Amino acid sequence: MESEAAATVQATRPRRAPRTPVTAILTDKRRRKPKSNNESQLPFLLQQSQKATVDDTYSQWKTLLPILYDSFVNHTLVWPSLSCRWGPQLEQAGSKTQRLYLSEQTNGSVPNTLVIANCETVNRQLNEKAHSPFVKKYKTIIHPGEVNRIRELPQNSKIVATHTDSPDILIWNTETQPDRYAVLGAPDSRPDLLLIGHQDDAEFALAMCPTEPFVLSGGKDKSVILWNIQDHITMAGSDSKSPGSSFKQTGEGSDKTGGPSVGPRGIYNGHKDTVEDVAFCPSSAQEFCSVGDDSCLMLWDARTGTSPAMKVEKAHDADLHCVDWNPHDNNLILTGSADNTVRVFDRRNLTSNGVGSPVYKFEGHRAAVLCVQWSPDKSSVFGSSAEDGLLNIWDCDRVGKKSERATKTPDGLFFQHAGHRDKVVDFHWSLLNPWTIVSVSDNCESIGGGGTLQIWRMSDLIYRPEDEVLTELEKFKSHVFTCTSKS
């Protein structure tokens, strides 16, 4: 079963010249180092050669949608979002609704915003140009600068942290922050709390601890910083008036430093270039890891000092963009890189002197990997998204178990989501709805601007055990034959 799913159209994404002012912003935002004119000619020529087949492959993917998915929602965004996260689940009129966090990265004609949306029941129909009726904007927060990253607090998911182009981390109580109307000239919303300590911009690396209200960040100052916001949780998490909005009755203000702030609990140095992503050990607020543009993976233990406890100096062959720690097995760490690969490291095989080899290496993307995340539903499964517009689902348990029908399928790949038409900048597995993913892409280089948000769940016939699926299909086959004979 998995071989047919893995053979889902591996559509190649075209990249046209930008058509909106926001494109220039986004191109620079994705932390890619500039290339010389000679280096940039090859991708351009490849784009032109691939363009003729893109429409056909995308059309083919659309025809397979009813077969490959149990549910699917496509929601067109006026402005791109660089991040997406699931929030708390709500019970409304007998139906289940879950909050979504995303952003609007604008070109300056209107303010940048942090958006809280409600997501309702999903379906299988695809409308490429429409705003889905199942995704409704609930509240808008005018954000001080572009929202590069959103992370929710596991102990209270109505509280989120955001990264922008500044050294500070902004903490928001999304429930008590006032709803704002984003028009040009409107003052910024005031964050409920500021986390200070970086000496340079901290744009992307951000994590919230699963066990305690700790926050982790990395930035251009090459440092990893740890905060404990426990002293402010009661204030920021209460349903009373938001402290960030108490300075002005409407919760508005151009000076985000006017609210309360928290200094770092620890500053950890060891990277030699920008820290691009960080992650907590799922069972400890004192253990965490980081990756950066120095191609290093570093593991830290706050109890033993501010130097790396373990590291891999050449974890990939290029910059590392993303990292995630397995919530089921504390020994496994996942990394993604500009070398187009995803790797899995076992911390039991790492040392403090920079030595360590991956236990798995996955090759299935054609461009830089931007996001990786372990599945909450199965310990061996994870997802990876990349600049090639694909979101791949992998299973470590399937490595080395290719069937004859899947000889061209990358080892370990068992599902490929090809619904986005440009780079998939972020995705998030739902903790409340099994095997459900929200993903976002920005469409500036393919279809001229805006973004796409998709909420989807692959067919359970794909991820369930094959013998179980075959037994069920055999029963269905017998039922069909019985009904046919009676008619």
Swiss-Prot record:
One of its GO terms (cellular component) is ESC/E(Z) complex. SMART domains: WD40. A motif (DWD box) lies at residues 288-303. Core histone-binding subunit that may target chromatin assembly factors, chromatin remodeling factors and histone deacetylases to their histone substrates in a manner that is regulated by nucleosomal DNA. Acts together with PDP1 and MSI4/FVE to regulate the function of the PRC2 complex on FLC. Residues 1-12 have a biased composition (Low complexity). A motif (Nuclear localization signal) lies at residues 14-21. GO terms for biological process: epigenetic regulation of gene expression; negative regulation of gene expression; regulation of DNA-templated transcription. Belongs to the WD repeat RBAP46/RBAP48/MSI1 family. It comes from the Eukaryota. Residues 237-252 have a biased composition (Polar residues). The keyword Nucleus applies. It is found in: Nucleus. The modification N-acetylmethionine is found at residue 1. Residues 1-44, 236-268 are annotated as: Disordered. The DWD box is required for interaction with DDB1A. WD repeats lie at residues 142-182, 197-237, 270-310, 315-355, 364-404, 419-466. It comes from Arabidopsis thaliana. The gene is MSI5. Its main location: nucleus. PANTHER family: WD40 REPEAT FAMILY. Keywords: Acetylation, Chromatin regulator, Nucleus, Repeat, Repressor, Transcription, Transcription regulation, WD repeat. This is WD-40 repeat-containing protein MSI5. Interacts with AHL16. Interacts with LHP1, PDP2, PDP3 and PDP6. Component of the PRC2 (polycomb repressive complex 2) complex which regulates histone methylation on histone H3K27. Disruption phenotype: Reduced H3K27me3 level but increased levels of histone H3 acetylation and H3K4me3 on FLC in the fve msi5 double mutant. InterPro entries: Histone-bd_RBBP4-like_N (IPR022052), WD40/YVTN_repeat-like_dom_sf (IPR015943), WD40_repeat_CS (IPR019775), WD40_repeat_dom_sf (IPR036322), WD40_rpt (IPR001680), WD_repeat_RBAP46/RBAP48/MSI1 (IPR050459).
